[in-house]
């Protein structure tokens, strides 16, 4: 299965970009929600001493991100993500360094090209995310339902996005559903 996706995508790559650390994100504010910092551009790939933390992004001729290779702690080994674009959704297929399928996700978009839902299924369970926007197109909430291997729903988390008067992101709160507790996971 890996070879099918790799061959299909590799033939469509028209340019590559190299970064130390993750740089591009598919879902809004994903770096802030998980505590990552955006990666740094690598100007000369030949000067890299280790592939750990190396991100190689492949783009097609329409400049769509279609491949992500993530360097891991084992030298010259990568995790692979292949992105396939359709009219109203994008499919992501994620493999580990031994080329085993770990996860498949579907990103659903509305007419404004905003993500509205994400469905994912992996070896350890799955998830469903709903993205809610206000009248000015600002993301205000993500509702994340989590499922175990047997597709039994476990926890539900809510990410709430707060903006300042200039409509700039001010903070992100995380809270479990049906609980008054919330935690600030990012603030400016």
Predicted regions, residues:
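Buried hydrophobic residues that stabilize the cores of well-folded domains
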Residues: 1-188
């Amino acid at each position: 299965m890996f070879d099918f996706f790799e061959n299909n995508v590799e033939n469509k790559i028209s340019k590559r970009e190299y970064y130390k650390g993750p740089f591009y994100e598919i879902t809004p504010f994903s770096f802030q929600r998980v505590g990552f910092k955006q990666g740094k551009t690598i100007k000369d790939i030949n000067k890299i001493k280790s592939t750990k933390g190396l991100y190689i992004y492949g783009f097609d001729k329409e400049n769509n991100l279609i491949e992500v290779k993530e360097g891991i702690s084992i030298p010259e080994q990568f995790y692979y993500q292949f992105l396939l674009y359709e009219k109203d959704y994008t499919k992501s297929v994620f493999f580990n360094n031994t080329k085993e399928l770990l996860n498949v996700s579907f990103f659903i978009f509305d007419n404004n090209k905003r993500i509205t839902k994400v469905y994912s299924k992996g070896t350890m369970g799955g998830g469903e995310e709903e993205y809610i926007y206000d009248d000015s197109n600002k993301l205000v909430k993500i509702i994340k339902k989590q499922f175990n291997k047997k597709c039994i729903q476990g926890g539900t988390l809510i990410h709430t996005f707060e903006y300042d008067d200039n409509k700039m992101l001010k903070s992100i709160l995380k809270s479990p559903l049906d609980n008054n507790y919330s935690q600030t996971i990012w603030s400016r």
